[in-house]
Amino acid sequence: MKAFQRDFIEFAIERGVLKFGEFTLKSGRVSPYFFNAGLFNRGGDLAKLGRFYANALMDAGVEFNVLFGPAYKGIPIATTTAVALADNHNLDVPYCFNRKEAKTHGEGGNLVGSPLEGKVMLVDDVITAGTAIRESMTLIEQQQASLSGVLIALDRQERGKGELSAIQEVERDFNTQVISIVSLADVVSYLGEKGGFDNEIAAINTYRENYGI
């Protein structure tokens, strides 16, 4: 695990974005942890979040021309990542996001920002069912662009309805790479290093035995 990954987990726990306990997911599964990126809701948090996304992107070394943030949660993530790439990595990258409903007046259409063209890096918080990715792929293909990769905060490393995780399904279906700042395995490693989280680690390991990939 790299320093920026350790720092990200610490940051997420400090801000209450990553919590431990019992949480019923949409799938009906009772998860021993919950990740809610919507709680990165202050200016300073958002600036810091962008730096983590930018670090993960640079670390992965995937070539791309434009950042795309699917509405709604992907919009501030794409924005802050673009700022962090410019400020910290000397990369002035265009970004784009979509509207949920197409605008019929003014500039019209359902895309805002830079043209969606070339190699697209899609940024979002997590992939649960892959629905947002599939909807975004329709937009990307309509613009004759290609999906270079997907960047998310946390890989839950959890099976969907079949044997694969939602991330593995996205990678298979769209022949692309999904990059995450951290994975659930990284979270477990971090908790082990910090100490005092034996119950949380045991609960996560049991959950992974049932639903992990």
From Swiss-Prot:
5-phospho-alpha-D-ribose 1-diphosphate binds at residues 26, 72-73, 99-100, 103, 105, 124-132. Orotate binds at residues 34-35, 128, 156. Pathway: Pyrimidine metabolism; UMP biosynthesis via de novo pathway; UMP from orotate: step 1/2. One of its GO terms (cellular component) is cytoplasm. Pfam families: Pribosyltran. The keyword Nucleotide-binding does not apply. One of its GO terms (biological process) is 'de novo' pyrimidine nucleobase biosynthetic process. It catalyses: orotidine 5'-phosphate + diphosphate = orotate + 5-phospho-alpha-D-ribose 1-diphosphate. Homodimer. This is Orotate phosphoribosyltransferase.
